[in-house]
C-alpha cells in the first residue's frame, strides 16, 4: 500500500491481484450471491483507491483495513437492497458449488444460518486468518469482543453441524 501511496503505477494492480481471491471469497460468503458479491468487491476496491492516502501502518494492518472496507461495502449493499433468503436450495447454487463435497456444502449452509455478525467474524478469523487484533480492527470492535464473537461462531457452527 505504501507503494500505491507513493504513486507507483503498477502497485495498485499488484495489490489488487494479491488480495482479489480472499476478498472476493469473503464478500461472496457474506452476500450469498455472485452479482451482489461482484458489486461489493468493486465497491471495496473503488473505496480503497479513493481512500489510499488515508491508510497508515500506525492505524493497523492493511489487510484488516481492507476487510473493514469490504465488510462496510457488504453492509451498505444489504441495507440498499432487499435480501434473498440466506439458505439456498440446491437449484439456486451456482454450478461449481454443486460439485463441492457434501461436507463443504454442509459448512456453507451452516455458515448461512449464523447471524451476520458471527458469520463475518468466522469468515475473517477462521477462514481468512486474521488474528484477534486484526479481526478487532476489521470489525471495529475490541479484541476481547472479537475473540468472543469468533468463539460463539465456532460454537454455533458445531451445533448446526451436529457436533457437541
Task: Indicate residue ranges for each PLM-predicted region.
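Short, charged helix-capping/linker segments at alpha-helix termini
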Residues: 5-14, 24-43, 57, 163-164
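Amphipathic alpha-helical segment used for protein-protein interaction
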Residues: 6-9, 82, 94-124, 128-138, ...
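Short amphipathic helical patch at the helix-1/turn junction of helix-turn-helix
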Residues: 16-17, 28, 125-127, 132, ...
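Amphipathic, Lys/Arg- and hydrophobic-enriched alpha-helical face
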Residues: 16-34, 51, 67, 111
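Structural recognition of an alpha-helix C-terminal capping motif at a helix-to-coil junction
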Residues: 25, 39-46, 60-72
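Hydrophobic positions on the alpha-helical face of helix-turn-helix-like DNA-binding modules
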Residues: 44, 69, 122, 135-136, ...
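Arg/Lys-rich amphipathic alpha helix in sigma70-family domain 2
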Residues: 50-57, 67-88, 100
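DNA-recognition helix of helix-turn-helix
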Residues: 75, 118, 127, 139-164
Amino acid at each position: 500500500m505504501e507503494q500505491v501511496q507513493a504513486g507507483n503505477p503498477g502497485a495498485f494492480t499488484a495489490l489488487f491481484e494479491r488480495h482479489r481471491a480472499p476478498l472476493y471469497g469473503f464478500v461472496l460468503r457474506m452476500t450469498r450471491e455472485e452479482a451482489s458479491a461482484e458489486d461489493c468487491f468493486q465497491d471495496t476496491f473503488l473505496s480503497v483507491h479513493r481512500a489510499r492516502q488515508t491508510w497508515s501502518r500506525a492505524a493497523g494492518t492493511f489487510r484488516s483495513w481492507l476487510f473493514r472496507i469490504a465488510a462496510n461495502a457488504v453492509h451498505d449493499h444489504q441495507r440498499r437492497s432487499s435480501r434473498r433468503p440466506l439458505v439456498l436450495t440446491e437449484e439456486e447454487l451456482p454450478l461449481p458449488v454443486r460439485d463441492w463435497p457434501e461436507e463443504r456444502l454442509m459448512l456453507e449452509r451452516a455458515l448461512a444460518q449464523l447471524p451476520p455478525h458471527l458469520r463475518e467474524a468466522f469468515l475473517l478469523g477462521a477462514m481468512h486468518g486474521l488474528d484477534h487484533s486484526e479481526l478487532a480492527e476489521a470489525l471495529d470492535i475490541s479484541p476481547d469482543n472479537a475473540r468472543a464473537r469468533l468463539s460463539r461462531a465456532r460454537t454455533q457452527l458445531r451445533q448446526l453441524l451436529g457436533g457437541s
